[in-house]
Amino acid sequence: MKYLLFILSIFFFNFNLKADIWTLEIGSLYSQCKPYQKANFDFEKLSKSNQVKAMLCKTTLVGIANTGYNLCQSLRWYYKSADNDKTKKALIGLSSWYANELVRNQNELIIGFNKWAENNQNFWKKYITGIAFKRDFMAKKYYCDL
């Protein structure tokens, strides 16, 4: 019985881990987002499978955008209370790589991500939560001005 539970736990753990990691890859997220954009962001035009993919796309990108915005707010607070130029430069550096301004239009965020992903296919196996997307797209398009 212990052996069976052990095998089952490995089986479920491995499939869950692979699914979670796969959805975080830029190429995978692009394949989830593009049909949603092609349907002009109308869920009713999508198959059930593509509706699920669209929700994964939207929640992932909005989550990243909101995290970057929260970081921007925190960095602004620290920047105002920084007492030397070295600290201020470090905070500006952090904001230029990881932070972003508030994203007001989620559809524009998805369109921008899709365009960025199409132009940066060399990053498709990288994770969306990594530096490349945050620095090269989010922090530039939605610049966090301290």
Segment roles from a protein language model:
Residues 44-75:
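N-terminal, post-signal-peptide region of Sec/Tat-exported proteins
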Residues 24, 28, 51-59, 133:
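Short, well-structured alpha-helical interface segments that form or flank functional binding sites
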Residues 4-10, 57, 61-64, 134, ...:
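Generic hydrophobic secondary-structure signal
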Residues 21-22, 28-42, 68-146:
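Compact alpha-helical subdomains of small soluble proteins
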Residues 1-19:
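Classical Sec-dependent N-terminal signal peptides that target proteins to the secretory pathway
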